[in-house]
Amino acid sequence: LVGSEMCIRDRFNAHLENKEAIEQRQEAIRELSTDLEYRQQIRLSGLLYKGKPADTSEIKEWANSPSYYRKHRLLRMIPATVSVINLLCISLTCLDILPASIAGGVFACFVVFSSVFSKGITKLQATYGKKLQILSTYADQILLTEKKDMHSPVLQELKAELTSRNQTASQAVRRLSKLMNALDQRNNLLISMLLNGLIFWELRQVMKIEQWKEVHASDLPRWIETVGEIDAYCSLATFAYNHPEYIYPKINSHSFHMQAKALGHPLMDRNKCVRNGIDIDKRPFFIIITGANMAGKSTYLRTVGVNYLLACMGAPVWADEMEIYPARLVTSLRTNDSLTDNESYFFAELKRLKLIIDKLEAGEEHFIILDEILKGTNSMDKQ
């Protein structure tokens, strides 16, 4: 799902720096990694309709937008009034009190009158109809989570978010999905004319959708975010399941200590990867990596950075043992120049270094990885 992809991306960009939060996330990932059936069901339901990146944000925007039709009292009365008039005309016609031509004329007038609202309803259907197809996927995933017993505190909190007033979240979301799918019946011109002439069906249907929105306007964005969070946990749990030899690192919150044995890069071939250790526990807390070209210095730095990031996300790492002090990871591994911004590679690296210095001087704690900084520039210019 798009929501889960955003959650995973956010976890990479803004990883945890709190020991308790990381350990709680480790517990949640451990729990889900043992439930293969649940994760496969979540994965399968998410593949049915993944949606587009803009879908979830536009659905949230729709949920927070004011109702258009229900805010007018007169418009709210129209469907019921039309239904009563048609029922009266049909009854009088059956009793031979009213000519059928008059009843037919009234019906035709209502068909024409209903077309006044068609443009706005068509716009609503065109804008959100396809996007709300993803709601059935959310409903399926919510239902799976509602039925599952959660044990870790993090997962219990997420499950508690999937609540509503007098019905489950899955029932509420499925109700909206059915309302939007029913609105598609207006694409059948014959049925649309018949229902609009009799009960102003399109306007009635849109008002039901707006009524749902008024009740669950604050719930829907929360449910979407919660489903994305759970799906993201399932992705990390699948990563843990696929690598049973990986270990969950120890988190140290007292003083800086970065120590690991036999670190390996998760993307490298396990048969070819040369695993190395790291140990930083003494002031001034830095190490310098030197060696010949193509000796693997950059790969080593990336290995340390990737595993450190995974550790701060609560995920397992490829190591025999590992202990970290969680801090913000800052790197200068792939600095790029920019012709449009008139920035050379050298200037871009200087800006990055200035940013790091400013953060450190502000008292922020960081784990910093620099790879061949200011390379390609002679020593005099570097000074």
Please give the residue ranges for each predicted region.
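Membrane-interface, cytosolic juxtamembrane amphipathic helix immediately N-terminal to a transmembrane helix
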Residues: 24-85, 212
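Long, charged/polar-rich coiled-coil alpha-helical scaffolds that serve as structural arms
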Residues: 10-37, 54, 130-133, 225
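Interdomain "pre-motor" coupling segment immediately N-terminal to P-loop NTPase/helicase cores
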Residues: 219-241
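Structural signal for well-ordered, non-membrane alpha-helices
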Residues: 139, 143, 231, 354-357
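Short, small-residue-biased leader/transition segments that mark boundaries at the very start
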Residues: 1-2, 6-7
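ATPase nucleotide-binding head domains, primarily ABC-like/P-loop NTPase cores
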Residues: 114-117, 236, 242-383
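A conserved P-loop NTPase coupling/switch region
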Residues: 65-227
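Coiled-coil heptad-register positions
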Residues: 37-40, 146, 231, 238
